[in-house]
């Protein structure tokens, strides 16, 4: 049976190019979350365990046998919660993917979604970014189940491609996770607008955990990310947003009744005219 409500901790990080430092930050944030709250799902941002700070830098690929997943599995069991790692550089059949990972309250570690749309862009006046130099493209959407809630997955740049979210809408997901590491320039212009649009058009909750702040790496690299981790309801209302720079979290309670209310008022699923294609 599906739970009527789902309590989520939407976590913001300032990850760097050092796994141990990032893992310590995740542990500290979990400790802070569970001091006063009992979320059933904790969501972390894209690149939570390793963030490349210098373009062209070699990214380490992790396998599920790595000790860091064992540690995160222990934490998931300890706190009796689902941990959603927004993305990690994961080796799958010898190839590197920017992949989400779900860790269940029983400690099971599951690679789930591989980022489909890779960030190969050239902003005016800035250096080119080519994510595809490091990663392979994922091939398909994915839907998780958390206590009966159907959860679609996307990662960062995916948010610009409405067709992915249209697929999730047609499958009537309850929630879409969009972990990210947005640039400041694109974040200021597009972050809020895109995420609210995706929630409204899919008539589902959208929870976007972000990297935010100034990242100073152990190898001398630096980077700025936009932050503004945000939770949005199916009507497009902002339930919570982290407006300060740096690590933090926001707790939100998602209601199945709210999803049903929105879909009853505006029954989009009966009005669709174009096929998926």
Regions of interest found by a model, annotated:
Residues 91-171, 184-193, 197, 255, ...:
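Active-site catalytic loop in hydrolytic enzyme cores
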Residues 257-277:
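A conserved C-terminal secondary-structure "cap"
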Residues 5-17, 43, 99, 149-158, ...:
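Active-site-proximal beta-strand elements of phosphoester/diester hydrolases
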Residues 65-84, 159-249:
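CN hydrolase (nitrilase-like) catalytic-core segments centered on the catalytic cysteine
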Residues 57, 101, 112-119, 230, ...:
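Short beta->alpha transition motifs characteristic of CBS
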Residues 19, 24-106, 110-112, 182-202:
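Cys-nucleophile CN-hydrolase/nitrilase-fold catalytic domain and related Cys-dependent amidase chemistry
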Residues 85, 99-102, 142-144, 229-231, ...:
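Short beta-strand scaffold segments in enzyme catalytic cores
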């Amino acid at each position: 049976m599906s739970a009527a409500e789902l309590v989520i901790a939407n976590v913001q990080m300032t990850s760097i190019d050092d796994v141990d430092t990032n893992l310590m930050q995740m542990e500290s944030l979990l400790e802070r979350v569970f001091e006063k709250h009992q979320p059933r799902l904790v969501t972390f941002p894209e690149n939570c365990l390793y963030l490349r700070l210098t373009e062209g830098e070699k990214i380490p690929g992790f396998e599920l046998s790595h000790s860091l997943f064992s540690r995160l599995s222990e934490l998931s069991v300890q706190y009796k919660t689902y941990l959603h790692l927004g993305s990690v550089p994961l080796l799958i059949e010898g190839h590197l993917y920017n992949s989400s990972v779900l860790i269940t309250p029983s400690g099971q570690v599951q690679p789930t979604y591989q980022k489909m749309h890779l960030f190969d862009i050239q902003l005016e006046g800035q250096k080119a970014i080519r994510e595809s130099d490091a990663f392979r493209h994922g091939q398909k959407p994915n839907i998780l189940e958390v206590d009966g809630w159907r959860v679609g997955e996307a990662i960062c740049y995916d948010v610009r491609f409405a067709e992915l979210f249209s697929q999730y809408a047609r499958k009537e997901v309850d929630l879409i996770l969009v972990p990210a590491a947005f640039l400041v320039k694109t974040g200021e212009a597009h972050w809020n607008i895109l995420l609210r649009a995706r929630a409204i058009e899919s008539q589902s909750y959208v929870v976007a955990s972000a990297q935010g702040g100034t990242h100073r790496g152990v190898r001398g690299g630096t980077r700025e990310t936009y932050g503004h981790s945000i939770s949005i309801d199916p009507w497009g209302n902002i339930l919570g947003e982290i407006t300060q720079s740096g690590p933090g979290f926001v707790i939100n309670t998602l209601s199945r009744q709210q999803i049903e209310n929105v879909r009853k008022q505006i029954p989009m699923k009966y009005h669709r005219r174009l096929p998926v294609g």
